[in-house]
Swiss-Prot record:
Tissues expressing the protein: Specifically expressed in retina.
Protein name: Photoreceptor cilium actin regulator
Origin: domain of life: Eukaryota
Species whose genome carries this gene: Homo sapiens (Human)
Keyword Lipoprotein tagged: yes
Compositional bias annotation for Pro residues: 1051-1063, 1071-1094
A GO BP annotation: protein localization to photoreceptor outer segment
Location(s) in or outside the cell: Cell projection, Cilium, Photoreceptor outer segment; Photoreceptor inner segment
Stretches with biased composition (Low complexity): 1018-1028
Length: 1288
């Protein structure tokens, strides 16, 4: 079209500005495009703009001239600067496909100039079309250039005269009319949109082909079946005929032998009867087979008719579509010179004919260039005919600019970015400076008529375009392109992951392109791309090293990509988190990404260098150094990093701002290298964790103990930590900042995904499984993050529900999953707890004074948040808010009123505390909780320290913790809930990570919800427990023996816990009057299987308890006192608690380990556990028998514990009143016990269920330092201690 003046301007600008003109010529470029095939390609690129703007076809039409002109101009361009070449190209409109071969030669040369010209023409086109002018002016005053372009036209043309022909001058700079541009935009919109439909068609036809392939043998089989039927019937008839021939005369009496009276006809009658029956059978078979065959025949005939109709319809549609496409093509060609444009349509310039050669080249270049529009290239490649594809190639190439802005400097930048990828090939001839500008030309060149010389021409043009882009988009391209070139193989993947960066979209686009144009196009240019990449890669490596040394300060484009980078970061972090869950990566990834970004800035060097070491061997040394740092921190970071990741998520705002395209890429690559991110998170953890050292030390242990599980839990913990880790100083702020959205989310999702938002981010897969069974848990999650406060406030009402639901599911899931997945799940379960434990611990330490009092209840609440890991962390931060909003209800009521606290505690405590992730967190958290309650009750700090050291046993800690809070609330129901919780706590990681567990939990949870909620929801559980103790004890006791049996059996069969919980729910349903207590008791029965499970775990727990023997021994007394009330209900639900006591005995053996160990075994193996289970059930049912259970706990811990439980039963009954107080106190004791359980946390790893039994023992001790020292105190002392604790 009249783009030649633009070329002249481009030439002038090129001559004057050198590379700068590359930017300016963009505005002028329309002329160049019109004049040169490159111009036409830019037109195609423009056409991409034009395709978007409707220019593609119009531009395409002139492109024939441009192709010819460009061919000649390109030939001259070799000799002359781009300006002359451009003008010549434009002036040479008629004829140079041959010169296009020259262009190939001079393309490296021209590529440099042409990029400028092409970009200039693009600029003018863009200005004319989409405001390329404005962007060009931003690049180089495109409009000014256009104005000056006319003046320059003469000067540029003079250049052209020197180099090419003055032909450009006559052409004059012509802007594409708005209608033309819009028409082309619409046309390309149509073409691109149709590509996806063609994809769908291909997919459908593929499916149809497969179906037919399956159907054909089926139909053949049908025919074979009928053939077989006919054959068998024929055999029957043939045999009958043979028979008739043989016996025809002998079937009846001989006529003359005897008189008819004397001839018995019995045989004949029998034969007649049989034959008549056979005839009936034959008639049935004949009708059946005949009707079926007729039906099949009619069906297939009808199908054939329908297929014929479909065929005729499709042919009509094909004709219509072909007509439309032909008209579109003819109209496009009609817009320009008919003769010339007919040729361009089949020429590279138009992109139609170029599809095969130039488009292939472009696709190759595009892959190299990482075209901006990865999808677009595919679309255009699919939809556009060869010429259209060439155009679209350019268009697609430019469309990415168009996406950024059709005529904007971004166009140049975008085109530059794609060029950058094309660059590699073009870059061979054009230098790396041309790389970015080459890309557009490369794209442009395919449309050029360089059909035969397309590879070289495209390449050359790509090169020429590249210089311009280099300047215009070089800032972005230089870094992103160099990056992409540098790590083009891996970085392309990274770019794909981080499409936000030019390199990302560039490289994505090339992949699309290759799809449109198969490897053919790729191979020719990719070799060059490799060479160019080597150059760029070196530069980029240097840049990367510098930026990395500066902690990746070269963040190219943080603009809207930051969010994406955060997401990518999440991916980066997420992979390590969800070792068990990869599906949940992305949600956590975002937060993790921001964490990664912040970590990248702080400790990103480690991950970045690690990734660079992968992607860039030049950076291997630095990466190794950082990797070593990462390796060091990985042990800590795996736990800490999870917290730091949360912290990273917490500092997400700051971190996310920093993410750059490079950072995104690095993170994308880091996503592959998860260990790197832990290093990053490590630094964040340091920021977030007030007690990183303590927790890190634990984390160090735990990472070793549970490296893989920790990763998965790290993912969870990360999310929990996102809210929980900052809880100390900025947790509240973060919760407030993130909590609004998350609170809203959690409030909205809390029922379904209360903690799921965090979990989704951190552990989407585990949580989703949990979702199945976590409807109740979600309300608890609401309590945990931001919604934790809000949802606790509004969720207090449904806390019981949520707790009731989760507790049983947790118990069941914990039992079944912990038993089955104890070995596997322990790691899974433990790792998240360590993370959260670390987080919780520091948070607990921070919160301990504040939440120490509320901790007793808060643990319940915080346990309530238990969407798993969030529980502990959320408890810490949620403790203030949840305690403020919910604690009054749960904590105060639980302390003052067993009923109120019990429902809440049971709800939150059972449900949330069951979060196994929280067990570790509760370990640390429980120490905080313990410290909190000890602060309330004194001497909890040592427990917290112990818990910190024992945080390895998060599960146990959490289980005990759960038992503690539930007992405070509704001991009867809580006991049942507590055990499920404890089981769940032990298996919450499993539950969280294994939806099956939670799925199982859900039924139980539902049952509990039905039955327990009645007690919990009414908040009458303790009253009911007190009131219904007599009758509930009966039914509970009746139920409890089965439960006890279950307890015994679950140890043998890990799955038993689930079935027993189910049956226990049934039992719970059975004792509907004692629903509050009996229901709780049946759940306890359900948990009882958990204790049986503990036998196997007991060994593990015994080992672990040995680690925490001192702590447990100290806590044992407290556990007795605290757990007596809580245990009665919680522990009824938690025969494993008695097992825990056995575990505790192992841990207590230091003081009274031997005796305790024996009681533990007795608990598991002997009727003692059953008795305890019965007592517990009774206590749970009566809610007054916690003490008996406590005694049992004590007895478990102590050899004489069994006899004591009966003695304690009266005390338990007498403690009914204390149960409310004890429930709150016990919750703290349970927390304390959890610290003790923390010691058993390693044991938990060994045996999750065991962890819960020790929990009972530990809880009492943890709550009361005195009981710790006197854990072997008489049952009466534990009782007194619970009372004292209750008082406190």
């Amino acid at each position: 079209m009249g783009c030649t003046p633009s070329h002249s301007d481009l030439v002038n600008s090129v001559a004057k500005s050198g590379i700068q003109f590359l930017k300016k010529p963009k505005a002028i470029r329309p002329g160049c495009q019109g004049g040169s095939e490159r111009g036409s390609i830019p037109l195609l690129v423009k056409n991409s703009t034009c395709y978007d703007a409707g220019e593609g076809l119009a531009e395409e039409q002139p492109s024939p001239r441009r192709n010819q002109t460009t061919a000649k101009g390109l030939c001259q361009l070799m000799g002359d600067p781009a300006s002359g070449k451009r003008k010549d190209m434009e002036g040479l409109i008629p004829g140079t496909k041959t010169s296009s071969s020259q262009l190939n030669k001079s393309q490296s040369h021209m590529a440099k100039d042409i990029p400028f010209k092409t970009q200039g023409s693009h600029g003018s086109q863009g200005a004319d079309f989409s405001g390329d002018e404005s962007e060009e002016s931003s690049t180089q005053d495109t409009s000014k250039w256009k104005r000056t372009a006319k003046c320059h036209t003469s000067s540029t043309q003079s250049h052209c005269y020197q180099t090419i022909h003055p032909a450009h001058e006559p052409e004059g700079k012509v802007d594409f009319p708005e209608p033309l541009v819009k028409a082309h935009q619409q046309a390309y919109t149509y073409l691109h949109s149709s590509l996806s439909k063609y994809e769908a068609i291909l997919c459908i036809i593929h499916q149809a082909t497969q179906t037919r392939e399956l159907l054909q043998p089926m139909v053949s089989f049908l025919l074979l079946c009928f053939e077989e039927i006919s054959q068998l019937l024929g055999e029957i008839s043939k045999d009958g005929e043979v028979l008739l021939q043989e016996v025809r005369e002998d079937l009846a009496w001989p006529l003359k032998k005897r008189e008819p009276q004397e001839q018995p006809n019995l045989l004949q009658q029998l034969l007649q009867y049989t034959v008549s029956k056979l005839q009936v059978l034959n008639g049935t078979v004949a009708s059946l087979t005949g009707s079926f065959l007729e039906g099949s025949s009619s069906y297939l005939h009808s199908t054939a008719t329908h297929l014929e109709n479909k065929l005729s319809t499709k042919r009509n549609v094909d004709e219509r579509l072909l007509r439309a496409l032909r008209q579109l093509e003819s109209l496009a060609s009609g817009c320009g010179d008919p003769g010339v444009q007919g040729l361009p349509l089949c020429s590279e310039d138009s992109g139609i004919g170029a599809d095969n050669e130039s488009v292939q080249s472009v696709d190759k270049l595009g892959k190299q260039t990482s075209w901006d529009l990865a999808p677009e290239p595919e679309e255009w490649k699919s939809v556009t005919s060869p010429h259209t594809e060439a155009r679209q190639s350019g268009h697609t190439w430019q469309q990415s600019p168009f996406c950024l802005g059709s005529g904007r400097p971004q166009d140049c930048l975008l085109s530059g970015a794609p060029m950058a990828k094309v660059q590699p090939r073009a870059q061979d001839e054009a230098r790396s400076p041309c790389l970015s500008s080459t890309s557009p030309e490369n794209i442009t060149s395919p449309p050029l008529k360089l059909g035969t010389s397309t590879p070289c021409d495209s390449f050359g043009i790509g090169v020429s375009v590249e210089p311009h882009l280099s300047k215009t988009s070089r800032p972005m391209d230089a870094s992103s392109l160099s990056d992409s070139e540098d790590s083009s193989p891996e970085e392309e993947e990274e770019d794909k992951m981080s499409s936000m960066s030019l390199c990302a979209w560039q490289e994505k686009t090339p992949h699309s392109r290759p799809q449109s144009s198969p490897a053919d196009r790729e191979s020719p240019f990719q070799a060059r791309t490799r060479r160019l990449r080597s150059l760029q890669a070196q530069e980029m490596i240097l840049k990367m090293k510098e930026s990395i040394s500066e902690r990746i300060k070269f963040v190219p484009v943080p603009c809207g990509h930051q969010d994406w980078s955060e997401e990518e970061e999440g991916r980066t972090v997420v992979p390590p988190r969800p070792s068990t869950v990869s599906g949940s990566r992305r949600a956590p990834e975002r937060q993790t990404r921001s964490q990664s970004e912040s970590c990248l800035q702080s400790h990103v060097e480690d991950p970045t260098f690690q990734e660079l070491r992968r992607v860039q061997r030049d950076l291997s040394q630095k990466l190794e150094a950082f990797y070593a740092l990462g390796a060091k921190g990985q042990g800590q970071s795996q736990e800490q990093i999870l917290q730091p990741r949360a912290a990273a998520v917490w500092p997400n705002g700051t971190c996310r701002v920093s993410p750059s395209n490079t950072t995104s890429r690095l993170k994308a690559s880091l996503t592959k290298n998860f260990s790197i991110l832990p290093s990053q998170d490590k630094s964040i953890l340091q920021k977030c964790n007030p007690h990183p050292e303590d927790e890190q030390g634990k984390a160090g242990k735990l990472p070793n103990a549970i490296p893989s599980g920790e990763v998965s839990e790290a993912a969870k913990a990360t999310d929990w930590n996102v809210r929980g880790c900052p809880t100390r100083t900025s947790v509240k702020k973060l919760i407030e900042t993130f909590s609004p959205t998350e609170s809203l989310r959690m409030l909205g999702d809390s029922k379904d995904a209360g903690a799921s938002p965090c979990l989704r981010n951190c552990i989407m897969p585990p949580r989703f499984p949990k979702y199945t069974g976590l409807a109740p848990l979600y309300p608890k999650p609401q309590i945990s993050p931001a919604s934790g406060r809000e949802s606790l406030k509004m969720g207090i009402g449904w806390k019981p529900l949520a707790p009731i639901f989760p507790p049983l599911p947790k118990a069941e899931a914990a039992k079944s999953e912990e038993l089955s997945c104890e070995m596997e799940g322990n790691l899974e379960h433990l790792p998240p707890p360590p993370m959260e434990v670390l987080m919780d611990k520091s948070f607990a330490s921070l919160e301990s004074p504040e939440s120490s009092k509320s901790t007793e209840n808060s643990p319940k609440e915080t346990q309530e948040p238990g969407p798993g890991e969030a529980g502990p962390t959320r408890r810490t931060w949620a403790s203030p808010k949840l305690r403020a909003s919910v604690s009054p209800l749960d904590l105060l009521p639980s302390k003052s009123t067993a009923s109120l606290t019990k429902p809440h505690s049971t709800g939150p405590g059972s449900g949330r505390s069951s979060c196994q992730p929280r067990k570790p967190a509760l370990d640390l958290s429980s120490p905080p909780a313990t410290s909190q309650s000890p602060e309330v009750k004194g001497g909890t700090w040592s427990q917290a320290e112990k818990a910190t050291s024992l945080y390895r046993q998060p599960r146990k800690a959490i289980a005990w913790h759960h038992s503690g809070p539930p007992s405070g609330q509704n001991r009867t129901s809580e006991s049942s809930l507590a055990r499920p919780r404890q089981s769940r706590e032990r298996s919450p990681p499993v539950g969280r990570k294994a939806s099956p567990t939670r799925t199982h939990w859900v039924p139980q949870a539902d049952k509990r919800r039905r039955s327990l909620p009645s007690s919990y929801r009414p908040a009458q559980p303790s009253p009911s427990a007190v009131q219904t103790p007599p009758s509930p004890p009966v039914s509970p006791r009746v139920l409890s023996p089965p439960t006890t049996k279950r307890r015994t059996s679950p140890p043998h069969q890990p799955k038993l816990p689930n079935p027993p919980p189910e049956s226990a729910p049934a039992q719970c349903k059975v004792p509907s009057p004692p629903t509050q207590h009996p229901e709780a008791s049946p759940p306890f029965s359900i948990p009882s299987p958990s204790p049986p499970m503990s036998p196997s775990q007991e060994h593990k727990e015994t080992r672990d308890s040995e680690d925490s023997q001192a702590v447990i021994a100290k806590v044992s007394g407290n556990t007795h006192s605290i757990f007596c009330p809580a245990t009665s209900s919680l522990f009824e639900a938690k025969p494993p608690l008695s097992t825990a006591h056995p575990l505790t005995p192992p841990s207590l053996p230091p003081e009274a380990g031997g005796p305790l160990g024996n009681p533990a075994e007795c608990w598991k193996n002997s009727s003692g556990p059953w008795l305890r289970a019965d007592s517990q059930r009774r206590a749970a049912l009566c809610a007054l028998n916690p003490l008996p259970f406590l005694r049992r706990t004590a007895s478990d811990r102590q050899p004489g514990g069994r006899p004591q439980p009966p003695t304690l039963d009266p005390t338990s009954t007498s403690y009914e009143s204390q149960l409310g107080q004890n429930s709150s106190s016990e919750e703290s004791p349970k927390k304390d016990t959890e610290p003790g359980s923390s010691p058993c946390s390693p044991e938990l790893q060994g045996g999750t269920r065991r962890a819960s039994p020790p929990e009972f023992c530990v809880l009492g001790h943890g709550l009361q330092p005195e009981p710790r020292t006197g854990h072997i105190q008489d049952k009466s002392q534990p009782e007194a201690q619970p009372q004292q604790e209750e008082v406190s």
